[in-house]
Structure formats: structure tokens, C-alpha cells
Amino acid sequence: MALRRLSKSVSSAIKAQYTLSRPSPLLRSRSLSSSPHYTSIGRPTNSFIGKINNSSITHATTTHGQLFPLSSPRRFCTTTAQVNQNEFTEMAWEGLINAFDAARESKQQIVESEHLMKALLEQKDGMARKIFTKAGIDNSSVLQATDLFISKQPTVSDASGQRLGSSLSVILENAKRHKKDMLDSYVSVEHFLLAYYSDTRFGQEFFRDMKLDIQVLKDAIKDVRGDQRVTDRNPESKYQALEKYGNDLTEMARRGKLDPVIGRDDEIRRCIQILCRRTKNNPVIIGEPGVGKTAIAEGLAQRIVRGDVPEPLMNRKLISLDMGSLLAGAKFRGDFEERLKAVMKEVSASNGQTILFIDEIHTVVGAGAMDGAMDASNLLKPMLGRGELRCIGATTLTEYRKYIEKDPALERRFQQVLCVQPSVEDTISILRGLRERYELHHGVTISDSALVSAAVLADRYITERFLPDKAIDLVDEAGAKLKMEITSKPTELDGIDRAVIKLEMEKLSLKNDTDKASKERLQKIENDLSTLKQKQKELNVQWEKEKSLMTKIRSFKEEIDRVNLEIESAEREYDLNRAAELKYGTLLSLQRQLEEAEKNLTNFRQFGQSLLREVVTDLDIAEIVSKWTGIPLSNLQQSEREKLVMLEEVLHHRVIGQDMAVKSVADAIRRSRAGLSDPNRPIASFMFMGPTGVGKTELAKALAGYLFNTENAIVRVDMSEYMEKHSVSRLVGAPPGYVGYEEGGQLTEVVRRRPYSVVLFDEIEKAHPDVFNILLQLLDDGRITDSQGRTVSFKNCVVIMTSNIGSHHILETLRNNEDSKEAVYEIMKRQVVELARQNFRPEFMNRIDEYIVFQPLDSNEISKIVELQMRRVKNSLEQKKIKLQYTKEAVDLLAQLGFDPNYGARPVKRVIQQMVENEIAVGILKGDFAEEDTVLVDVDHLASDNKLVIKKLESNASAEEMAA
């Protein structure tokens, strides 16, 4: 039944008058003229107060319990009980209104006390349910008994004209009496429950059957209400405030719900020391996200449960306050403050037995403050300063500086406990302590090598997060991945299932064919199906057996974990008989069963290949890191080993010539993949110098293509865009107050999202000198701090800078020197590097790993480049289903036309575009070349100037035949 809110303008005038057709003994015992609750019936004006059973309710009276509007004719009436909605709490009034609905659903006209009880019990999170639970009464049995009583009452076919029963009238009057006795301002649900002891129709016999004494009920009400009084229409929000808005960490530790806390002894001891102070006994744990601030509070809770704390903290409760729950649902001004005051009152009333833990404590600054109201921090300050409220806070360094330090009055009430990131060795210890929990959750076994690998790889490659959180996440995700594989169908079995389905479909399509070939194919399919189905059956049996054995092992481990918790609980309570029975009886039996199940699984796997894998290894951890960062960290397979050894050949597929440059780059990659490079610097840093068009940028693209299987993974920064002083800041981000501050730097943002990449600074000599100040830190420490203070790691990048400095020296040296190629290269390199030293500052040059000088291309290398470009044209035409063939003479002619030592290989591309691609494009548009045609590129030997000729190749003729 919907209960409509009253508008403020008419709420003060809302009343419902009920005429009692048969006054109760309680009413008869009073003088009607002197009772303030009764008045003779007048004719008050109608005021809308809500709806009952979809009928509008106004000021009304009842004749024999029937509700009538006051304006309607009344045949008789005796007395009138005035019931004002504003005298009831929201939950009590809602229960009263819903009682009419309960009666209507039961097809009963008279609304009695049992209908009110049913309505109160059906309220979600209602007070009646909480009180009965505290009294040790099962709510479902109470509701069942109420329904049984209601079902025995007479029913009518039409329950629209509902009447108010005398028993409910008695409940209403007695509830008001209990309200006065308890010094409350409003009638609440607990007053209704106490009034049932005066109800001779239903309540007295009902509570007697439930064996619920009135004193037990009063004690339960006191437990739920505490010291709170009903002073507003929504008092339930202040009852059991700590239980409603907090989580008891000590109780969770007692039940084994918290993860074990390894280490952090100094921080926990410091917190205990601060908590034992007389005033300002409030530690605040400060540290980066993920270093274990909340774990310190959980570790303290576990110590309290074990009794491993000083006397002032023995048997204390540590409650984690949920600020979100405090704020949620606080619709009106003052609701939040009342809830928080109720929490503080409960903590203060516990006389130091309760310690609050507020995670993300910076949220209390400004929480609940609106329209000039005080925020939560101002409500907490007085009690924090006097030592009446012991509170542990936790927040990050940034948020502490941003929120807490700006309020000195709040800051001085807290004592800082700094929580630093643990070392890799400490992280490994933490992971070993957590291993059992994650093994139990995922049903897998986690090897020690996986834990070590998680700590080491997380520290090196996941740079923007902190230990131990990132290492724990790696182990958790690797366990989840393996669990997914265990619960899913094995790859081998899944492949067979798909093959069977494919053959079944093929069999159906061939079933009606009568030719010999189809029958032979059908027979072959049936034979294959028979073999596959037999193998499928065997694998299914093996899979189910393996899965059942692994499930049994997991259930034994869970049972052992539960028994260990019971042993700890018994030892804490000094129930030594129970502890001995569990430890030397139940636990030993379970351990024997676990060993037997593990032995059965091992024996089963000895007879065939295992379909399921249950051990998380360092390979799994490396695979997860690779997926997170894009860094290829999985163990080197034999194919990749061979590929690394032959890396020069791989790069030479795209870069023609430049043997010295390719070898230097390949050596750097091999060092990195073998784990020999300096972990605190970029993988390698090169300066490529040489004439234009000799392959400097192409080598960088080829390297990116090898590392990522796509050359788009290269981070290319064209330094000609950074020639002005004001443009330099774009690399790391605009300073505060400038446009683009929130967007970050054009270099740093890309590398943050793709930490393993080839960073190419193209034409570095064109950059403004201030750019080199930024590059110094990048080349030396492998990191840059952007404009927002974030540290961006370049430790997994290959940094390449290209420059055209000294290109004229290179050309002159090659023209005028007759020595060997190696000797000429050394002379040329010395000259170019010396020229670079004159153009760049010494501190910049000193940080580059290697200077690589590219040589001009000769005619043979240009011919190879022509072949590369022609293969590119051929691949483009194949997409249009047109084949391309070319003769050696055509390649030589194109190389001759495109060769210019001063410009490198770029003229080749222009020549091929003009003489080959343009002609073929015109032929396609004219219709000379269509699909399935073969286009021949050849030299016209009959012409005096050996022109290039492009024509359609006749079928069954090769390029060599046409050339002949």
C-alpha cells in the first residue's frame, strides 16, 4: 500500500478520528470528559491525509468501526479517539496503514491487532524483526503463527468496507501510554510490541506461545535502541548505528575473514603506541595507494583477537566506519549529522571499548556540508581532541596534503604513521603468507617461483602502481586464469568436439548423393567419425575423472581451513578438550584424506597425458605481465631464440645495406631479452647519423615491427615541431594555467600507455636547445616527470634519435677515399661524431649508448630497394586479383633512373610511382587490366632510349619468355 507524504502546509492539521463502537475496559475505566484523548464529535473541516486501500482519507470518524468522512451523515456515535499522524514515527505509521492492506488481502473487513503484527513483520529491515531477533525469536516462525491466526478468522467476499477492530484500538491507546513511560516524543514500533501484552484477543496468547516474557522484550528493545530516545519521526536510522554503518574488523578476524598480515610490525606497534595515549590518541596511516594501509588496521584487529596487544587495547572492538552508508539515504538536512552523532555517541558510551577505523579519512572533510551546515570533520574534532573518540585513519599522501593539511585544527588531532612501499624481498614474504588463501579460493596450486616472479616482474615493469598490491593482483589473475581453464572444456577435447560437428554436417550433406566419389567420401567420413567419437569418449571420461578428483582435493582443503579456524577459536576460549579433539582427531583425518586424494590424482595422471593443469608457474605470471604492459616476457621458446640469433637477417628484410647499424641495434635487443641490460636505463639509446634517404627511419620502423609485429607501435616525435622555445613544454605537458594542462604531454602520455615501445626523435638537430634538457633525464635514469607530477618510465623503451649532421662529410669521404670499406667507415664515423659534438652539448652526447653512422647507398643496394618497392606494388595489385611480373632489366632501369647518392632511396619511390604505378592505374581505369590478368613490367629493347613498357601478359607465357 502506497503511503503518500504529507505536504508541510497541511501536515499540522492532519488527524484521523475513530469512533469506538465497543469501548475497551481501558476506555471504560476513564472519564471521557476529563481524558485528553477523547472529545465529543464536532464537524472539523476535511483535510487530506493519505490513502487507505486506494481511497482518500480525510478527518473521519467511525461508526461501529466503519470509516466515514465527517461530512457524511452519521446515525450514531459515542466517543471519538483522535489519532494524529504526526504522533507516529514513519515506520509505525506505515505499519498501521499496511495493516488495512493485510486485512483486505485476507478478505477480512475488521482490521485487528494480528493484521498490524503481520504488517510490522513484513517491513523490510523493520524494527519488529530486529527486536525479535535480539530476543532470540525466529521471525519466520512469528510470521507463520500470525498468518495461521489470521486464517482462522471469518472472511467476507467483499472486504472493501473495512472496519477498525477493538483490539487494534487498544493497541493504539496502550502504545501512547508506553511512549509517555519511555519519555519518547513519537509512537514507535517498539511501543506497539509492548502494547500487545495488553491485547487479550491476540497479543497475550501469542507471546505466551512464543515464550517471550515482557522483560525479555524490553531488554531486546534496549539492546536495539541503546541509550537513544525517539525524538523524531525516523529514529531507526540512529539505532545500532555502529552495526549499521560499520564493519566489525575484530569479529571478521575472529571468523577468519581477513587475510593474514605479514610484516608491518613497526607500523602496527606505532599505531598501538598512539592509541594508548591519553589525548589525541588518533593515528592516521599515510602512504601511496596499494602499499598496505588498510592491512595495518586489519593486522591490529587480528592482534586484538589473539590478545597480542597491551592492556589498554585488550578485548577492544575495531569498527571500520563506512562513510558511504552514513551519507546514503540522508534525504533531509540534519539526517547525516544525526547519524554521525549517533555513531559518536555509541563509541563514547562504550568507555573506550570501541576504536573507529575510517578508511579514506579525507572524505570526512566536507562530507555532509551543504547550505552552511557543518561537515563531518567539525563534528569529530571536539571528541578527537579530548580523547573520547579513538580513531584510526588511512589516506594517501596526495589526499592528506590536499584535504587534511588544509585544516590545521583537524591535522593536529591526528598523529602520522608513514607506510612506505615494501621491498621486493618483503613482498615475496607477503605473497608466501597469502598463498594459501588464493590457492583455496581458486582451487589451484601456486608455485614459489610464481610468487618470486610476481614480485620481481611487478617491481620492474609495472611502474605506475605500488608493491605489494600489484604483485598480489598478478598472482590473483594468474590463479583466476588457471581456474577458468580447469572449469572450461580442455582445448584438445574442444577441438575434437568441433571436428565431430563439422564431419556430422558434411555427412548429412553427402547422404543423398549417389555418385561414386560421394559414397567414397561418405565412407571416409564415417570412419573418421567413429575414430573421433571413440577418442572423444575417452577424453570425456578422463576429463570428468580429473575434474572430480581436483574438486575433492579442493573440498578437503576448504574443510581443513574451517577446522583450523575452529581450533584457533577453541584455543582462544580455553576450550582445550574441543581444541585437542579437532587437532588430533578431525584435522589428522582430513589431512590423511587429502594426501590420499592427491596420491590418486598423481597415479591417475601417470597413465596418460593430463588434460587439466593446476599449478600456477612463473610462465603464467609473465604472461599476465605481458598482457598488462605489452612487454614480451614469456620464456624464450626455441623459435624465438633462433629469431634473436638471426635478428640481423630479420631486420635486413626491410633495411638494405647498413650492416653496422643493423648489428648494433640487434646486439642491444639481444642484451635486453637475455636480461643483461641495465634495468634503470632505457633498453638502448642510439643516434642515427647519415645522409637523407639511407634508412635511418626505416630501421626504427623495422625494429618496432619486430618487437610488436606492427610498425604502428613506434612513438615518433618530429623534432621540427619543437623549434620554438614555447613548444618544448608540449613534450611533458603544458604548465598549470595554460591550455592543455589536463591533457598531459605528447610524449609522456603515449609512453605511459605503451611503456614498451620504440621512441623515435626524428631530425633531432632541428629541435630547440631546451629539448635536450628534458632528454638528459630520459637517457640517464630512464624516466621523466610530466607537468602533473607523474613519473613516466622509459626503462622499457628503445630511444632512437636521427640526424642529418655531417651528411656532406660522408659523401665527400666516400668519393675521395680509395681505402677498404671498413677503414673508410671508421674515418667517416670519427668525422661525423666530431661534428655532432660541436653541435650538441657534452652532457647530452655523453648519455647516448652508441653513435651509428649510415653510409650512402650504392647502385646494387638501390636495385634491392627497387625490388622491395616492386613487391609492395605487387601486393597491392593482388588485392584486386591482378598479378604483377617484372624482369631484371626493368629493375635495373628503375634503379638507374632512381639512383642519386645525395638523396638516397627516396627518388626510387618517386620513379616507381611515375613510371609504374601511374601507368598501371590508367590501364585499370581504361579496362586494359582486369581481374585474373597478369601485368608485365619490361624494357622496350627496340627503343633507342630503353623505355619502360607495361603490358598485359598473354596466358601461359612467363616474364622470361616475353623478355626473350
From Swiss-Prot:
Example of a GO biological process term: protein refolding
Transit peptide per record: 1-39
Binding annotation for ATP: 287-294, 690-697
Main location: mitochondrion
Span list, region Repeat 2: 164-227
Factors inducing expression: By heat stress.
GO molecular function, one term: ATP binding
Subcellular location per the Swiss-Prot or TrEMBL entry: Mitochondrion
Pfam families named among the record's database cross-references: AAA, AAA_2, AAA_lid_9, Clp_N, ClpB_D2-small
Residue span of region II: 616-807
Residue segments, region I: 242-490
Keywords: ATP-binding, Chaperone, Mitochondrion, Nucleotide-binding, Repeat, Transit peptide
InterPro entries listed in its UniProt record: AAA+_ATPase, ATPase_AAA_core, Chaperonin_ClpB, Clp_ATPase_C, Clp_N_dom_sf, Clp_R_dom, ClpA/B, ClpA/B_CS1
Cellular component terms (Gene Ontology): chloroplast; chloroplast envelope; chloroplast stroma; mitochondrion
Function: Molecular chaperone that does not seem to be involved in heat stress response or tolerance.
NCBIfam families: chaperone_ClpB
Entry protein name: Chaperone protein ClpB4, mitochondrial
Gene encoding the protein: CLPB4
